[in-house]
Every structure is written in structure tokens, then in C-alpha cells.
A protein has these predicted regions:
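Short His-centered aromatic/hydrophobic patch
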Residues: 91-99, 115
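A conserved mid-protein helix/loop that constitutes part of the nucleotide-sugar donor-binding site
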Residues: 19-30, 194-213, 233-237, 313, ...
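Carbohydrate-associated surface elements
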Residues: 152, 173
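Nucleotide-sugar donor phosphate/pyrophosphate-binding loop at the beta->alpha transition
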Residues: 71-75, 110-112, 120-142
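Acidic donor-binding loop of glycosyltransferase active sites
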Residues: 265-279, 292
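Short hydrophobic beta-strand element within catalytic cores of glycosyltransferases
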Residues: 42-43, 284, 293-296, 306
């Protein structure tokens, strides 16, 4: 949109991690300028987003909160919004939604909230989920528009009493990619890939148990696991399970990587054995864009993306035997992995691109701006 002054938008984010929701924020900052919007960030926590993001040209304000209700920060953000004439506030987490509601009330700038996953099913700690869900529900009352990344999350908001005229379902999207998968022939070792911020709800323990079952039955499989762990304690727990299952020589832990293409080239298929708390996993879309068949679970937004038997195979959550059975079909060549990968790649191009995501978000912004 050359010749048009871009509309300034402030995204309030946590900034602690660089995982799926942060990939959405990053891609929006890269793609929204083509739609006439200039993104800035305000990070409410110290973390890795500032250094790992691709959108290094987007201004970033590091304003860590001193407490969960930091009125000083809200006043500081309100001054920033007025000084830089931000026209939209876009929030992404329960924490940022609470701050955003207060800043919107102070400035009169409309707030948009992006629901990336169900707050009530985000961690294994029930009390924390309940607290975050209550904070989010209260905070969202101040949002003019609510963006959900999947139909399952849209239904959740409707069940909570939010009206349809405020909700817009905009699926996540990722850049299109060349086909990167490794070809597989039955009889060779099958490399299963998983990319995640490893935390309990991602189900890595279930995948390890499934691999142990497969190896016990004589199947040749290994795991290429990419990404950091949420905490050192959780990392120690997972590595100990790997040792107890006798899988130490069959698992590669790479840690965080920036070149996802290089990692996808190591994989024959992609697995995400999520237990709960998924809106629409970005990493599944990225795997599909790379032409990998996907083995995942029947959790919330995942079946909206992966069509069972066409783009991959879906198992019940928290079912190592069911997951092993799905993987075994690839080991034995009972499914056409290449055809599934090609199907998923075309589906991503047609329905889940970064450009279509940005176009949808821009349309929401325009609803809130004066003509």
C-alpha cells in the first residue's frame, strides 16, 4: 500500500517465550504493513521474543510488570499510546488482556484480543488455569473484537456468553514452503520429528512411550526433537524417562533452532501428540507447508487442520498404544506418506497462509477505525 501512511498498532504481548503464539505475532508484524498497518510491540515480561523474532524492524518496548496488577505500567502504556498515536491495541494473553483493558479505558483506543488457546486448559495446574481463565473472561469484556484461531475456540467463547457479532475466527497461517520431507522406504529407519516448546501438555512422554512399544515390536524408529524445554525440572524428568525406556540412542534433542527448514529435512513425518490446550498449532501448519505427513491427536483445533487419513493420521490423546499404531502404519508402508504430505502442503497453501491470516486481522482492524 505505497503512498498511504500506515496505521500504528500496538501489540501487547508477554514476550517470555518464542513459541506458537509468538510466531503469530512475529508473522503479523511482517505481513500487516502490506495491509496498511505498522506494528509495534510492548513486552510485559523479560524473555527471548525480542532476540528471536524475525520482525526486527518493528519497534519493541520492554516494560516488564512488577506485579500482576501494575497500575504504574498501565499509566506508562497509556502515555505511550497517546504519544505514538496508536489506533488499535492488540492483546494476546490473559495478562496482556488485563493490561489492555485498563489502557483502552484510559485512552479510548479500541482493543482487539487474540485467543490462541483455551486458558482454562493451558497447564497441568488447575488453580492456575482457573485464575487465568477468570482474568481473561473479565478482561475480554473490554475488547471490541475477539479473534479466535480455530472454530473450537470460537465455540468456547460463545459458551462463555460472548456474542457472535464480536467474534471473528481467523485461522493461523504460515509462509508457504518448498517440499522438504525425506522420502521413506519400508524397512529403513523411520525418523519421526517433533518441534515444540516442550511442556507437559505437548505429550512428549506419550510419544516416547509409543516409540518404546514400536522398538519392542522390532520397528526401527528414532525421534528428532527440536526446541527448548519450558523448565529445567521438566527437562530432567523427560530425559530420565528417555533413559528408563532405553531410548537414549534413538532420540536427538537439538534444543532451540532458527532454521526450521534444515530440521524438517531430517524428518520423514511430523508428530505432535498434544494432550490438551491447542488452538491451532503453528508447528503443524509449518510441517504441512514443508510437505510432511502429520501424526497428531484429536485435540481441539488440530482436526480442523489435519484431515485424518488425508493429510496424516490422528489418534486419541494420551494413548501411547494408539499413537504407536498410527506410526506403525508408516513404518510398514501401509499409508502413502508422500501423498499425505502433498495433500497437507496444498491444504496449507489454500487455507492457512501467513498472508491470509494478516488479511483477516487487517479486516478486523478496519471494522474499528472511523471511515
Amino acid at each position: 500500500m505505497t503512498g498511504v501512511t500506515p496505521v500504528p498498532v500496538l501489540h501487547l504481548i508477554n514476550g517470555e517465550f518464542y513459541a506458537g503464539a509468538e510466531r503469530v505475532q512475529d508473522l503479523l508484524a511482517l505481513e500487516l504493513p502490506a495491509q496498511g498497518f505498522a506494528v509495534s510491540f510492548a513486552c510485559l515480561k523479560e524473555g527471548v521474543f525480542a532476540t528471536r523474532r524475525r520482525c526486527q524492524d518493528a519497534p519493541l518496548h520492554l516494560l516488564p510488570m512488577k506485579s500482576r496488577v501494575d497500575l504504574r505500567l498501565c499509566l506508562e502504556l497509556a502515555r505511550l499510546v497517546r504519544a505514538q498515536n496508536f489506533r488499535i491495541l492488540h492483546t494476546h494473553t490473559p495478562r496482556s488482556a488485563l493490561v489492555g483493558r485498563l489502557v483502552a479505558a484510559l485512552t479510548g483506543v479500541p482493543m482487539v484480543h487474540h485467543v490462541h488457546s483455551p486458558a482454562e486448559r493451558d497447564t497441568e495446574q488447575g488453580w492456575r488455569n482457573t485464575r487465568n481463565a477468570l482474568v481473561e473472561k473479565f478482561s475480554l469484556r473490554g475488547a471490541r473484537r475477539l479473534i479466535t484461531v480455530s472454530a473450537s475456540l470460537e465455540r468456547m467463547l460463545r459458551e462463555q456468553g460472548f456474542t457472535a457479532n464480536r467474534i471473528r475466527c481467523i485461522p493461523n497461517g504460515v509462509p508457504v514452503s518448498e517440499c522438504l520431507r525425506r522420502s521413506y522406504q519400508p524397512g529403513e529407519e523411520l525418523t519421526v520429528g517433533m518441534i515444540a516448546l516442550f511442556r507437559p501438555r505437548k505429550g512428549i512422554e506419550v510419544l516416547l512411550q509409543a516409540m518404546a512399544q514400536l522398538q519392542g515390536a522390532g520397528a526401527r524408529v528414532r525421534l528428532h526433537a527440536v526446541g527448548p524445554f519450558e523448565t529445567p525440572e521438566y527437562q530432567r524428568s523427560v530425559l530420565e524417562l528417555t533413559r528408563r525406556l532405553g531410548l537414549e540412542s534413538s532420540v536427538t534433542w537439538t534444543g532451540f533452532r532458527t532454521d526450521m527448514g534444515a530440521e524438517f529435512r531430517q524428518m520423514h513425518l511430523f508428530a505432535l501428540p498434544s494432550l490438551y490446550g491447542e488452538g491451532m498449532p503453528m508447528v503443524v501448519l509449518e510441517a504441512m507447508a514443508a510437505g510432511l505427513p502429520v501424526v497428531s491427536t484429536l485435540v481441539e483445533g488440530i482436526p480442523e487442520v489435519v484431515r485424518d487419513g488425508r493429510d496424516g493420521l490422528l489418534a486419541q490423546a494420551d494413548d501411547p498404544t494408539g499413537l504407536a499404531a498410527a506410526l506403525l502404519r508408516f513404518v510398514r508402508g501401509e499409508v502413502d506418506a508422500a501423498a499425505m504430505g502433498d495433500s497437507g502442503r496444498q491444504r496449507q497453501r489454500d487455507n492457512f497462509s501467513d498472508k491470509s491470516m494478516a488479511s483477516g486481522v487487517a479486516a478486523v482492524y478496519r471494522e474499528l477505525l472511523p471511515p
